[in-house]
Amino acid sequence: AIKQWTLPVIFRVDDSLIALQELARWWRSRLTDLRVIGITGSVGKSSTKELIASVLERDFVVLKSEGNLNNEIGLPLTLLQLEPKHQRAVLEMGMYARGEITRLAELAQPIVGVVTNVGPVHLERLGAIEAIAAAKAELVQALPLDGTAILNYDDPRVLAMREATRARVLTYGL
C-alpha cells in the first residue's frame, strides 16, 4: 500500500503583510459578481456596518467584517473568508495614517463607500482635523465611476468629500 502524506504548504515571502494583502486582493478579484460596501468614519463604523448588513441580508448572501477587523491585517483576513456564494460584503475601513484607506480600497474594490463623520480621532498621528478628513476621503476617491458615495450631510467635512469623487453621491442626515 502507498502511504499518503499530508504536508502543509509553506510559502517563503519577504514581507508577510504584503503577501497577505496581495493574496486577499487576488482572491477578491476572482469574485467578479461580488459588490463591496466600504465604511469609514471617526465613529459609527461598526453600527453602520451592522445596520447595512442587516438590511442586505434580507435579499443577499452577505459577509461583514467581524468586530474591528478594519485595518491592513483585518480587512485582508476578512476578504479571505469570502466564498463564491457571497453576493455582498460590508467592510469597515479604519486608518491611523494617510494612504491606509487607499490601500484597503485597492484590496477590497468597493463599489459603494459610506463616510459616517470626521472627528478628532487619531489627531495625535495626523496633526489636524483636516488631515483626518483627507484620510477618510480616500475611500470616496477610490470609488469607480459607476460607484456610489454615501455621505453624511450634517458633517461639513464629509459633505465636502463630494468634490473628491467621480462616483454618484447620495447624502443622508437629519
Describe the predicted segments one by one:
Residues 1, 14, 67, 167-174:
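Beta-strand->loop->alpha-helix junctions that form or flank phosphate-binding loops
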Residues 6, 12, 17-153, 157-165:
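Phosphate-binding loop of NTP-binding sites
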